[in-house]
């Protein structure tokens, strides 16, 4: 049975956010690199660093937290995996869902790479719906 790397990074980011940890380390693959790039561009994470340890590459993500006097409190954002290995979900560009009326982000895997719902609508292409972020 194969590993679902997208579900692993979503779960690790969600767990670190709920535990108010500022730094998360995830495995580096081409898919995770594209998803992390989208998260950084959309402002859900603060910083990304590439780290190499024992011939394995990792991404070190710095999550965005607001500072409080007593302790940092998290910006509430949710990630949800939609298409999974047992049940793939595809959509054409006209039927890509809008999360929170366009405030959230849908990440798609298209024939032109991994992109957000806004980019896919502008280019007029659909694809596999990987996850929702809001």
Swiss-Prot record:
Keyword Transit peptide present in the record's keywords: the answer is: no
GO CC list: chloroplast; ribonucleoprotein complex; ribosome
Q: Its Gene Ontology molecular function terms?
A: rRNA binding; structural constituent of ribosome
Keyword vocabulary terms for this entry? Chloroplast, Plastid, Ribonucleoprotein, Ribosomal protein, RNA-binding, rRNA-binding
Subcellular localization, as worded in the UniProt entry: Plastid, Chloroplast
Entry-linked InterPro entries: Ribosomal_uS8, Ribosomal_uS8_CS, Ribosomal_uS8_sf
The Swiss-Prot or TrEMBL record describes its family as follows: Belongs to the universal ribosomal protein uS8 family.
* HAMAP family xref list: Ribosomal_uS8_B
Q: What protein name applies here? A: Small ribosomal subunit protein uS8c
From which lineage does this chain's organism come?
Eukaryota, Viridiplantae, Streptophyta, Embryophyta, Tracheophyta
Q: Which gene encodes it?
A: rps8
